[in-house]
């Protein structure tokens, strides 16, 4: 007799190496909590609908809990010959309680069973990711609060462009994460749907109650189409996309952390707790955590591409190709959660070298736009002002000086309307103060931005 749940149709057994290739237990054992949760809801519903007895249901439920506990305590080992988490649990259940265990699968297929597990898992993980993002945002806001008046060079093309507030710069990542969080929150509408009861693809002849299992499992909605219920993996693609994009944002931040911590920049000092050394160069302090996060975006994006290609051209309904949805999702979720925790600790513990930042911004031409704006305030057309300032900058480069070093007489050779007040106008501090357009880097604008950000975080906490 075959030990396969589907063995009745077959005359020969697969060889062991075929079982190993076919099996998913090595990774879908991670779904034991969700599988037991779904089976308990299903057993409860079967009893309620008088498909099995109350005693049978209670026996099933009690032993499912014992199986989960035994596995988590290392007392139970699953077998590749039983393929997956579903059949391993069912086999163990029947071994323990006999015939009643074989009734659990009534009105259910592994197709809707695994879909239910994956919906439960993805929902739980997305909710946790949302919490991690919000926590990291809190850390960013706290750091920004301390550095509203800290001035640093703003860059375009990795060339110094204009003076900006350090708070304004790092708050950019708050808003990236806010969009990421919003995407995850919105995706819950498409994750929080119960496929349980769809069976293999067409529903079941048994008088099941899908609304009851939906309620027991805490799903917000039901799939309206049984074929769609077992075929849908859109929510996994969507989750992988949101993870990948969040990782892209973390990667961009990591690149800046790496640059800021170089001896050439010295804008920040990373904590030893988030750095490593060299096995040959004793002086080294490497930003390995930031580098790892920057690199890990490759694997999460790879999982997204893999899932999209796996689904391309798949006919309805379930196909074994769908077994490939799990490892990538599990790894991507693990990667993002770890990256968010590491990044929060790294940012919370890093030292911002305010004096170095302010000194750096005094030795460049990032106030050149300010000089052009000054001329515009003297009724000079902007394009003309741009040309004049370009010539002044070129002259300064030849002389090895900066705009604040140019004598007034030399300024007036370029335009007679330039007066003594130009020197106050061009200080980095005043460059910031004058930028008060909504969302700009000026102190008052940044303070308002922080107020809005704090209100958003408080609002999210109350939901």
Curated annotation (Swiss-Prot):
Catalytic activity as recorded in UniProt: 2-(N(omega)-L-arginino)succinate = fumarate + L-arginine
GO CC term (a single one): cytosol
InterPro entries on file: Arg_succ_lyase_C, Argininosuccinate_lyase, Fumarase/histidase_N, Fumarate_lyase_CS, Fumarate_lyase_fam, Fumarate_lyase_N, L-Aspartase-like
Keywords: Amino-acid biosynthesis, Arginine biosynthesis, Cytoplasm, Lyase
Pathway membership: Amino-acid biosynthesis; L-arginine biosynthesis; L-arginine from L-ornithine and carbamoyl phosphate: step 3/3
Subcellular localization, as worded in the UniProt entry: Cytoplasm
Enzyme class: lyase
Keyword match Hydrolase: no
Record-listed E.C. numbers: 4.3.2.1
Biological-process GO terms, alphabetical: arginine biosynthetic process via ornithine; L-arginine biosynthetic process
Pfam name, any one: ASL_C2
GO molecular function, one term: argininosuccinate lyase activity
PANTHER family associated with the record: ARGININOSUCCINATE LYASE
Protein family per UniProt: Belongs to the lyase 1 family. Argininosuccinate lyase subfamily.
Official protein name in the record: Argininosuccinate lyase
């Amino acid at each position: 007799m075959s030990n396969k749940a589907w063995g009745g149709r077959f005359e020969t057994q697969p060889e062991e190496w075929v079982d190993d290739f076919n099996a998913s237990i090595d990774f879908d054992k991670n779904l034991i909590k969700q599988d037991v949760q779904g089976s308990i809801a299903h057993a409860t519903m079967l009893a309620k609908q008088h498909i099995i007895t109350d005693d049978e249901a209670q026996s099933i439920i009690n032993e499912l809990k014992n199986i989960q506990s035994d596995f988590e305590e290392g007392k139970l080992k699953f077998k590749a010959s039983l393929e997956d988490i579903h059949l391993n649990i069912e086999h163990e259940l029947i071994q323990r309680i006999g015939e009643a265990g074989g009734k659990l699968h009534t009105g259910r297929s592994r197709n809707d069973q695994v879909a239910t597990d994956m919906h439960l898992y993805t929902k739980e993980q997305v909710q946790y990711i949302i919490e991690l993002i919000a926590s990291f945002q809190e850390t960013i806001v706290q750091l920004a609060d301390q550095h509203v008046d800290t001035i640093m060079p703003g860059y375009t093309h990795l060339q110094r462009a204009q003076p900006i507030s350090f708070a304004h710069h790092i708050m950019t990542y708050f808003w990236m994460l806010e969009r990421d969080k919003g995407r995850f929150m919105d995706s819950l509408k498409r994750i929080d749907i119960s496929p349980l009861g769809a069976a293999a693809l067409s529903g079941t002849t048994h008088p099941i109650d899908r609304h009851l299992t939906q309620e027991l499992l805490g799903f917000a909605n039901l799939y309206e189409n049984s074929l769609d219920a077992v075929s849908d993996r859109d929510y996994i693609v969507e989750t992988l996309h949101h993870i990948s994009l969040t990782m892209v944002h973390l990667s961009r931040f990591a690149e800046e952390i790496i640059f800021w911590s170089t001896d050439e920049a010295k804008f920040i000092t990373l904590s030893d707790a988030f750095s490593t050394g060299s096995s040959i160069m004793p002086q080294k302090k490497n930003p390995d955590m930031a580098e790892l996060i920057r690199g890990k975006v490759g694997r999460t994006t790879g999982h997204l591409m893999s899932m999209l290609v796996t689904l391309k051209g798949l006919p309805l309904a379930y196909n074994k190709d769908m077994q490939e949805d799990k490892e990538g999702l599990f790894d991507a979720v693990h990667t993002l959660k770890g990256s968010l925790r590491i990044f929060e600790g790294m940012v919370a513990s890093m030292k911002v070298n305010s004096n170095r930042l302010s000194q750096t911004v005094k030795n460049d031409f990032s106030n050149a736009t300010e000089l052009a704006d000054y001329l515009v305030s003297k009724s000079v057309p902007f394009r003309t002002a741009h040309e004049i300032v370009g010539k002044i900058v070129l002259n300064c480069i030849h002389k090895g000086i900066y705009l604040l070093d140019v004598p007034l007489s030399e300024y007036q050779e370029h335009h007679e309307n330039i007066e003594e007040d130009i020197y106050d106008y061009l200080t980095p501090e005043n460059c910031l103060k004058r930028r008060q357009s909504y969302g700009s880097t000026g102190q008052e604008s940044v303070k308002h931005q922080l107020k809005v950000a704090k209100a958003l975080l408080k609002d999210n906490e109350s939901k």
